[in-house]
């Protein structure tokens, strides 16, 4: 419970920027609470006036009723509207904070968590969290003020009789506490299963071509049915707890009301109480049932929100990528791996005691079988992964001493899996730090990547929207857009991770010529299975199981007739 309180206090801290609006919420619901108490008071005056036959007083009551309803509506509008304003702004600000954290988390987080579960946190969980911090607060303020107002009126009218209500409060407290624990557990399960649902949807949509080609529609439908069914079952269990708790609380309140009515009818209790006072008291006691019911019902929203808050705050409290570097050098492209080891979870070593020096402007090709550690090696250069032991130097500076954004601004990378965004061709080439690049530079980069001609044949040329992942383009065209992006960056270090593997022979020929020129005076690391693309590299490094087993020029390695020779023969046969 102490931990829950801390979480709720943290939730409420998000309301600080909106304290002025929150004050209007308090005023609005305060007016509404006053009208609830006034209903009982008005009944007292009406009944007493009727008994006394006071015609002058009776003439005012219609106007008072209209005023009462008007102010009640005004209070509800103020409270409801400004609560909604806070709620929507909270969703906006928390989502911004989560997204800012997500894009700064280490790459390992994305390897350990599915995209479906991640998106569920930013969409579904934030909505649930807002229910705790704003919607629940709305009910607690509105019905809390009504409850306090009615209890105050009851105590003022007959404090001895009102104490009967407090006798039943511990029973209500026990019911709410037990329901809270159960609903918290179920809320976490509902959120997890919602992540599973999102995961299945994103996988099937992203891999729709594979689903169709392997006739996997029925299989994916079953997967979606199972994950949705799990979510449904846990949701229904929450409904059972919620709907069982509410009638039990109402039963306890009915018992309290019955006791009050029974005692109120005793002559010794009635005393000199007027009919108006008696009816007003019973009315106020009856009006108390609804806000108390609402306050117990809000517990379900509160528990869902707190469960979501644990999930959201857990993400927000994760450490961002380490960026303790303070140096911002203009790199020349000198790279040195000094006894570098990269170890994954489970003590699996992707790189083992690796030593390699690359001179500025040198083109080094790294080849090897799948799983040899080639991609892991280049990931270290942009700190997508961190060195487990040993040291990595750029221009004789330890890589961790270089400020992270400065480092990445000076490394251009064409990934094995091309990533394009649902934006224009121009925006995809001039992406990120390249935004605002001159049109002439963008066109020059596209021409160097032999992309300009096909871009000009698109419906709107450089303004053509590519669609999700650029699926409107062929594999070779997507690859050339990515290469144009890397060329435009004009970084001192260029990494080509199997960059020409998706190109047809003609495109590969032209792009290889473009790269031969682009690689001048630039340190280039090329990873490729198609060995024909790296024959002109200054040096070829052959890796196996995270270690260098051979290195030299193309001709030198062929003469050795070792591992590279075997890879070359296999490529030639293919």
Swiss-Prot record:
Catalytic activity field: ATP + H2O + lipid A-core oligosaccharideSide 1 = ADP + phosphate + lipid A-core oligosaccharideSide 2
Any GO CC annotation of this UniProt entry: plasma membrane
Disulfide feature: none
EC number(s) recorded for this UniProt protein: 7.5.2.6
A GO molecular function held by the record: ABC-type oligopeptide transporter activity
Keyword terms of this UniProt record: ATP-binding, Cell inner membrane, Cell membrane, Lipid transport, Membrane, Nucleotide-binding, Translocase, Transmembrane, Transmembrane helix, Transport
Gene3D superfamilies found in the cross-reference section: ABC transporter type 1, transmembrane domain (1.20.1560.10), P-loop containing nucleotide triphosphate hydrolases (3.40.50.300)
The ABC transmembrane type-1 domain, residue ranges: 23-304
One Pfam assignment: ABC_tran
Membrane topology term: Multi-pass membrane protein
Amino-acid positions noted as binding ATP in the UniProt annotation, renumbered to this chain: 368-375
Cell location: Cell inner membrane
Statement: the UniProt record of this protein carries the keyword Transmembrane helix: yes
ABC transporter domain location: 335-570
CDD domains linked to this entry: ABC_6TM_MsbA_like
Keyword Translocase: yes
InterPro entries membership: AAA+_ATPase, ABC1_TM_dom, ABC1_TM_sf, ABC_transporter-like_ATP-bd, ABC_transporter-like_CS, ABC_transpr_lipidA, P-loop_NTPase, Type_1_exporter
Main location: membrane
NCBIfam families: MsbA_lipidA
Record text about domains: In MsbA the ATP-binding domain (NBD) and the transmembrane domain (TMD) are fused.
Function: Involved in lipopolysaccharide (LPS) biosynthesis. Translocates lipid A-core from the inner to the outer leaflet of the inner membrane. Transmembrane domains (TMD) form a pore in the inner membrane and the ATP-binding domain (NBD) is responsible for energy generation.
Oligomeric and partner information: Homodimer.
Family: Belongs to the ABC transporter superfamily. Lipid exporter (TC 3.A.1.106) family.
UniProt-recorded name of the protein: ATP-dependent lipid A-core flippase
């Amino acid at each position: 419970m102490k931990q829950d309180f801390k979480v709720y206090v943290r939730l409420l801290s998000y309301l600080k920027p909106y304290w002025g609006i929150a004050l209007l919420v308090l005023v609005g619901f305060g007016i509404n609470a006053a009208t609830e108490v006034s209903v009982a008071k008005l009944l007292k005056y009406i009944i007493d006036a009727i008994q006394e036959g006071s015609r002058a007083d009776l003439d005012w009551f219609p106007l008072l009723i209209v005023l009462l309803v008007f102010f009640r509506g005004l209070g509800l509008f103020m409270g409801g509207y400004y609560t909604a304003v806070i709620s929507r702004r909270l969703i906006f600000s928390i989502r911004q904070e989560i997204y800012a954290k997500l894009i700064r988390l280490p790459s390992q987080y994305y390897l350990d968590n599915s995209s479906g579960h991640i998106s569920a946190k930013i969409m579904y969980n934030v909505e649930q969290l807002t229910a705790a911090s704003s919607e629940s607060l709305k009910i607690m303020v509105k019905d809390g003020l009504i409850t306090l107002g009615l209890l105050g009126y009851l105590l003022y009218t007959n404090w001895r009789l009102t104490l009967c209500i407090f006798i039943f409060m511990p029973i209500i407290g026990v019911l709410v506490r037990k329901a809270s624990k159960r609903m918290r557990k179920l809320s976490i399960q509902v959120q997890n299963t919602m992540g599973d649902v999102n995961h299945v949807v994103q996988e099937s949509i992203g891999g729709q071509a594979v689903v169709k080609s392997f006739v996997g529609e029925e299989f994916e439908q079953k997967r979606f049915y199972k994950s949705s069914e799990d979510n449904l079952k846990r949701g229904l269990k929450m409904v059972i707890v919620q709907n069982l708790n509410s009638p039990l609380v109402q039963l306890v309140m009915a018992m309290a009301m019955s006791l009050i009515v029974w005692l109120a009818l005793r002559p010794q209790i009635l005393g000199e109480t007027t009919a108006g006072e008696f009816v007003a008291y019973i009315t106020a006691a009856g009006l108390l049932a609804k806000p108390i019911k609402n306050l117990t019902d809000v517990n379900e929203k509160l528990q869902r929100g707190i469960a979501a808050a644990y999930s959201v705050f857990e993400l927000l409290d994760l450490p961002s990528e380490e960026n303790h570097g303070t140096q911002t050098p203009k790199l020349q492209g000198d790279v040195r791996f000094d006894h570098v080891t990269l170890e994954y979870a489970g003590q699996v070593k992707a790189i083992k005691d690796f030593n390699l020096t690359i001179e500025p402007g040198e083109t080094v090709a790294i080849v090897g079988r799948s799983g040899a550690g080639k991609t892991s090696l280049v990931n270290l250069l942009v700190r997508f992964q961190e060195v487990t032991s040993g040291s990595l130097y750029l221009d004789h500076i330890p890589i961790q001493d270089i400020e992270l954004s400065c480092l990445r601004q000076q490394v251009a990378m064409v990934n094995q899996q091309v990533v394009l965004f649902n934006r224009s061709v121009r925006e995809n080439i001039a992406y990120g730090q390249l935004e605002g690049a001159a049109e002439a530079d963008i066109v020059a980069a596209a021409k160097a990547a032999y992309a300009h001609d096909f871009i000009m044949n698109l419906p709107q040329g450089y303004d053509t929207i590519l669609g999700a992942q650029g699926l409107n383009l062929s594999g070779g065209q997507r690859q050339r857009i990515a290469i144009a992006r890397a060329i435009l960056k004009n970084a001192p270090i260029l990494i080509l991770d199997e960059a020409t593997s998706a190109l047809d022979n003609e495109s590969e020929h032209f792009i290889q010529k473009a790269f031969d020129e682009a690689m001048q005076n630039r340190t280039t690391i090329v990873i490729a299975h198609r060995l024909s693309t790296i024959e002109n590299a200054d040096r070829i490094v052959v890796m196996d199981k995270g270690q260098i087993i051979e290195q030299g020029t193309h001709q030198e390695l062929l003469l050795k007739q070792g591992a590279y020779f075997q890879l070359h023969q296999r490529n030639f046969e293919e």
